[in-house]
């Protein structure tokens, strides 16, 4: 127990350094819409159909390295990028990340990640599992409170699977043990916990474990 607490204390100190600006994370790739072309127009038509069908509007992430309303990433590792549109609709679970795959030159909606909240706080594309492709880490602002919601997802065969979900005040995605897979380290401050809570999530035995 003491060893675990000491480990979390060291991680908390590392996160403090990251938040203070001592380490600057570079962006390896910018996820943006393709240039105007037939492909661009087809993607736009596919997204417009979802916008009108769900009475939704664009809802770009408000912070982090990826703040475009529509982003491109090869989520499943097949060599072809998926398009992810970040939208907000009415009703329950209004925040929606819509994933479009390209088939024979056309884009088709393959899955939707729905979540609660008022806005997308951040979006990152990282290698969590060591499997082909990259995972999607989404932060959501729940309300005007400090706490936010963080979820990680994998995408394979046209379907999304949630890997973890937790509330957080601050988080970082870093490879702490040098195995080539990123770990998720988060801090959570609550009124009843004046010292805060530190949690580490890493891929072990086929799942994200805390």
Predicted regions and their residues:
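N-terminal secretory signal peptides that target proteins for export/translocation
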Residues: 1-3
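Beta-propeller-forming repeat regions
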Residues: 21-210
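Sec-dependent N-terminal signal peptides of Gram-positive bacterial secreted proteins and lipoproteins
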Residues: 5-26
């Amino acid at each position: 127990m003491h060893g675990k607490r000491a480990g979390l204390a060291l991680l908390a100190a590392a996160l403090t350094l990251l938040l203070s600006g001592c380490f600057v994370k570079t962006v390896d790739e910018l996820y943006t819409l393709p240039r105007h072309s037939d492909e661009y127009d087809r993607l736009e038509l596919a997204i417009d159909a979802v916008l009108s069908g769900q009475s939704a509007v664009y809802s770009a992430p408000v912070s982090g390295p990826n703040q475009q309303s529509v982003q491109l990433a090869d989520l499943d590792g097949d060599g072809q990028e998926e398009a992810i549109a970040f939208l907000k609709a009415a009703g329950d679970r209004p925040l929606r990340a819509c994933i479009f795959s390209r088939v024979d030159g056309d884009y088709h909606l393959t899955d939707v990640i729905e979540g609660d909240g008022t806005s997308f706080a951040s979006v990152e594309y990282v290698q969590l599992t060591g499997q082909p492709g990259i995972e999607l880490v989404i932060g959501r602002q729940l309300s005007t409170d400090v706490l936010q919601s963080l979820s990680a997802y994998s995408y394979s065969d046209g379907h999304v699977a949630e890997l973890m979900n937790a509330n957080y005040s601050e988080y970082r995605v870093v490879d702490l043990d040098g195995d080539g897979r990123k770990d998720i380290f988060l801090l959570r401050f609550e009124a009843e916990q004046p010292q805060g809570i530190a949690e580490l999530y890493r891929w072990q035995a086929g799942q994200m474990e805390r």
